[in-house]
Amino acid sequence: KVIAKAVIMAIGVTPEVELAKQAGLEIGVTGGIKVNHHYQTSAPHVYAVGDAIEVTHFITQKPTRLTLAGPAQRQARAAADHMYGRTYRNTGVIGSSVIQCFNMNAASTGLNEKDCQKEGIAYQTAYVIPKDKVGLMPNARPLFFKLIFADPSGQLLGAQAMGEGNVDKRIDIIASLIMKHGNLEDLKELELSYSPLFGTAKDVVNMAALVGLNVLNGEYKQVPVTEIRELQESDAFIIDAREAWEFEEGHIKGAVNIPFSEFRNRLDEIPKDEPVYVHCLSSQRSYNMVKALNMRGFDNAYNLMGSFLGLSMYEYFTDKTEGREPIVTNYRFDLL
C-alpha cells in the first residue's frame, strides 16, 4: 500500500510504430509515420491516420505529433475521400484540448509561451481573470484566461483557460479564429451570445483582445506573473491597490498598501525615480491605477499581470511541493 492524499493515474497509450518500421514505411523526424497531404505513407496504396502519424502544425508549418480523437477521425474521413478521388483541404492541426480535474476545467489551443520561444516567434500575452458570468448571478466563478498573440501583427497564436465554468467555449472561439488567421481586432469585434446566466456582456475573450490591443499600442506597461517573485526578492517598490481589509487577509511581503480609492490623496508616497509595480486582486483596479498614474506623470508605473489572484495560483503549488518560502503572507483563489 502507498499512503497518499491523492493518486493521479496517467495511463494514456503510447502510439506504436514498430510494425510500420518493420514494413519499411518511412518514419518522420518526430518518430511518427511520415504521410503526405492525403495521409499516404511511403508505401504504395498504404494510408495511415491517427496517433501514430506525423502531422503538420497549422501555425508553425512544422511536423508534430498529436494524440487526439477529433483530428484522427477527420484524418480517416480525408483518407477515405482521397481513395474515392474526392478533394480534401488539409489545414494541419493546432492541438485544441480540454480536461476536467475535480471541480476545475482546463483547456488550451495553439501555441503556448514555451512553443513561441522555441520557434523564435515574437509574441505578447494578455492575462485576464474576470468572472465567467455576471457577478450577481449564482455560481459566478473566476475564469483564468491567457491569450497569446504575435507582436506586432496581433495574429492569434494560442490560448489557455482554467476555471469551474465553460472554459471549452472560450478556447473553441480562439481555435476557430486561429484557423481563419484571425487577429486581436477580429476577436475584439466578435459578437457572441449573451445572457447574465451564461456570460458577461463583454466576454472574457473580448476582454483579452482589448487588453492585448492596449499592450500592442503601448497604452501601458506590464510585468508577467512569472517575474513577481524576482521583484519581491529584490525589494522592488510594489503597490497593493486593494482595500486595507483585503490587504490584511493576504499580501505580497514588503508590498505597500495604497488602495485605489485613496491613491489620489497619497501620490507623495509613490516614487518617480524607480519602477513602481501595481497590483490588486485580478488586475482591474491596478490597471486603472496605472493609467491614472501615467496621466499624472508617473511613467515608471507597471501593472502586474494576474495580480494577487494570478500570483497565488502561480506560486502555491511550488511553494507547497518544494517547501519554498512563500512571498505572500497568505494565498487567495477567488474573486470578491
List PLM regions with ranges.
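Short, structured coil segments at secondary-structure junctions
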Residues: 23, 42, 119, 251-253, ...
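A short, polar/charged loop-to-alpha-helix boundary motif
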Residues: 165-183
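Redox-cofactor binding/interface segments in oxidoreductases and associated redox assembly factors
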Residues: 9, 28, 48, 239-240, ...
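Mid-to-C-terminal Rossmann-like scaffold of FAD/NAD(P)H-dependent oxidoreductases
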Residues: 52-164, 200, 204-230
